[in-house]
């Protein structure tokens, strides 16, 4: 198992939630941190927490959809720390709405952040990770990268894409003999503001959906999620399921095959009747 002391870790979406918790846990484990977010207020909060721990930190505002800016950022991080060992492509947004009433621009936005943001981060940092001789790509998908549910087609598409991209990358690194490990992360319901901050079509009762998520679905704290993720990274796991719900739902999908679709549609309609 690998440790984190002396490693340089990049964390996107580090201004809140899982990203912030990952940065803090990595700092406590002896890593140096390059953190970024579009939320500068949250980013500053994370930076202060890391400095209080005593970790070397570089904090920058970064929109993961801006490829050119990401390229410059990767070079700046390498120049600042001298190396890069790990990248946690964590930045993401949520969206709710049936395809029939969802506009193209909303689907594109979700794909830009949740999929292309991951691709951008992976591509621009991969040469530095290979050069380090001890690299690791950690891409955050979702339980919605394991199965689909109504009202989440755009998010499902992005998270399924992250899963496929990352699993292919892991095999490519192994076949090429590159010193880069690759892990896909599938969080279940985490106690963050992702649903509260999401966008949605007009027919979605966002307040009710948020209440349902907070009360019935958000079972794991970001801090617990971070510990689970980092334990998976230490063990070089190909896939990390975060939370008891993620483990249970993954098992259901494996056991039922495509039959899960009817089951989940029924459950979703009863749990969130106002969402459609």
Q: How would you describe each model-predicted region?
A:
Residues 174-244:
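SDR active-site lid
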Residues 142:
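Residue(s) in the substrate-gating loop at a strand-loop-helix junction
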Residues 98-99, 103-109:
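Substrate-binding pocket helix/loop in short-chain dehydrogenase/reductase
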Residues 53-56, 76-87, 95:
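A glycine-rich helix->loop->beta "capping" turn
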Residues 122, 158:
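Active-site helix of classical SDR
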Residues 40-41, 60-72, 104:
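The beta1-alpha1 cofactor-binding region of Rossmann-like NAD(H)/NADP(H)-dependent oxidoreductases
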Residues 8, 15-17:
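Conserved glycine-rich cofactor-binding loop
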